[in-house]
Amino acid sequence: MPYSLEEQTYFMQEALKEAEKSLQKAEIPIGCVIVKDGEIIGRGHNAREESNQAIMHAEMMAINEANAHEGNWRLLDTTLFVTIEPCVMCSGAIGLARIPHVIYGASNQKFGGADSLYQILTDERLNHRVQVERGLLAADCANIMQTFFRQGRERKKIAKHLIKEQSDPFD
């Protein structure tokens, strides 16, 4: 189902809310929602650190929730909104779930599986191809990632300072 720009913006803002949940837990802030007939049927945010599971990406969580909602592994007639371009693993899962449409915010130059590094979602050698749109609220989506990495650098500085204070009592 095609959505208007206003509707797409709303759903990406919902994905950004999911990304914010990850940011609050010091996780890489990626958020995702899956929409069918104008209703969000799956939500997810990155939770690898919290769960100690490498596959707990936003897209994987949203796919699992949408599968449960639909009672089916096939997520036909859905659109996946994600703040950052899906990685290779998530791109594979999107194809396997038969999600026909993906809209993402910012590119993923290091791990992108939709456009930047690999084109898994549109590869003609695969039996399921996905319509991909990019750049929706890209600045907002990139901004939350920059905030995460800036906070990480600040946490490292504080930790380094605390370690120095503890190890050198004569400072």
From Swiss-Prot:
Task: Report the superkingdom from the record.
Answer: Bacteria
Q: Which GO terms describe its biological process?
A: tRNA wobble adenosine to inosine editing
Where is the signal peptide, in residue numbers? none
| Record Gene3D superfamilies | Cytidine Deaminase, domain 2
EC nos: 3.5.4.33
- The CMP/dCMP-type deaminase domain is annotated at 6-133
Which residues participate in Zn(2+) binding?
H57, C87, C90
Q: Does the keyword Oxidoreductase apply?
A: no
InterPro entries recorded: APOBEC/CMP_deaminase_Zn-bd, CMP_dCMP_dom, Cytidine_deaminase-like, tRNA_aden_deaminase
Xref: SUPFAM superfamilies: Cytidine deaminase-like (SSF53927)
What does the record's cofactor remark say about binding?
Binds 1 zinc ion per subunit.
Keywords, A to Z, come to:
Hydrolase, Metal-binding, tRNA processing, Zinc
Catalyzed reactions: adenosine(34) in tRNA + H2O + H(+) = inosine(34) in tRNA + NH4(+)
What does UniProt list as catalytic? Answer: E59
Disulphide connectivity of cysteines:
none
Give the record's family classification: Belongs to the cytidine and deoxycytidylate deaminase family.
Oligomer status and interactors:
Homodimer.
Specify the protein name.
tRNA-specific adenosine deaminase
Source organism per entry reads Streptococcus pyogenes serotype M6 (strain ATCC BAA-946 / MGAS10394)
What's the gene? tadA
